[in-house]
Swiss-Prot record:
Gene3D superfamilies: 3.40.50.2300, 6.10.250.690, Winged helix-like DNA-binding domain superfamily/Winged helix DNA-binding domain (1.10.10.10). GO terms for cellular component: cytosol; protein-DNA complex. This is Virulence transcriptional regulatory protein PhoP. It comes from Salmonella typhimurium (strain LT2 / SGSC1412 / ATCC 700720). It comes from the Bacteria. Transmembrane segments: none annotated. Disruption phenotype: Decreases survival in macrophages. Decreases tolerance to acid stress. Abnormal expression of genes encoding virulence proteins. Decreases fitness in the spleen and liver of mouse. 10,000-fold reduction in virulence in male BALB/c mice (for strain ATCC 14028). Double knockout with phoQ decreases virulence in mouse. Its main location: cytoplasm. GO terms for molecular function: DNA-binding transcription activator activity; phosphorelay response regulator activity; transcription cis-regulatory region binding. Residues 3-117 form the Response regulatory domain. The keyword Lipid biosynthesis does not apply.
């Protein structure tokens, strides 16, 4: 399963991509413009982005260049109607990793996504290490003092997000969106229950409270 960011201004195509990707088991954030794409990029930490070039507020190539200049390293797959070789060179030169020309079959998009993730897995670290905490991204495991802590899928998602944002407050709404993409399933007290369980499991291996509730803002992971 991947978290996919789809950036497409055409509402029908955006919805089609989102549904097809979700049906394949992926989590999907769908943005209609560059501003919304920036929000999802920073809040939800996607594994890969699918970007259309014709966005209403910023050209797709400009968006990709801006991401790359800010050291955003996630794989980017471009959707384009431009078929000339010069256009394809420009797409790849912008910092995109691959492209699909319109019209396309969703199977081709899926195949290119998987290829990019395989290629990227050899380049990016699969472990986040903040001693004595360690997150194995490929195994989806949290270890403390080299002991694996058994977490549910929701608990792991919360811990990975907090540790990725070490020292930064993560909003409650952001966590809720990651756990429950469907708004009808969200209940704010669920996060509080999960946090309580997480703290107990962690304190069995590490005596200090590393998850702080920041009133009115969210949650903070920080070693003391």
């Amino acid at each position: 399963m991947m978290r996919v960011l789809v950036v497409e201004d055409n509402a029908l195509l955006r919805h089609h991509l989102k549904v097809q990707l979700q049906d394949s088991g992926h989590q999907v954030d769908a943005a209609e413009d560059a501003r919304e794409a920036d929000y999802y990029l920073n809040e939800h930490l996607p594994d890969i982005a699918i970007v259309d070039l014709g966005l209403p507020d910023e050209d797709g190539l400009s968006l990709i260049r801006r991401w790359r200049s800010s050291d955003v390293s996630l794989p980017v797959l471009v959707l384009t109607a431009r078929e000339g070789w010069q256009d394809k060179v420009e797409v790849l030169s912008s910092g995109a990793d691959d492209y699909v020309t319109k019209p396309f079959h969703i199977e081709e998009v899926m195949a290119r996504m998987q290829a990019l993730m395989r290629r990227n897995s050899g380049l990016a670290s699969q472990v986040i290490n903040i001693p004595p905490f360690q997150v194995d991204l490929s195994r989806r495991e949290l270890s403390v003092n080299e002991e694996v802590i058994k977490l549910t899928a929701f608990e792991y998602t919360i811990m990975e997000t907090l540790i990725r944002n070490n020292g930064k407050v993560v909003s409650k709404d952001s966590l809720m969106l990651q756990l429950y993409p469907d708004a009808e399933l969200r209940e704010s007290h669920t996060i509080d229950v999960l946090m309580g369980r997480l703290r107990k499991k962690i304190q069995a291996q590490y005596p200090h409270d590393v998850i702080t509730t920041v009133r009115g803002q969210g949650y903070l992971f920080e070693l003391r």
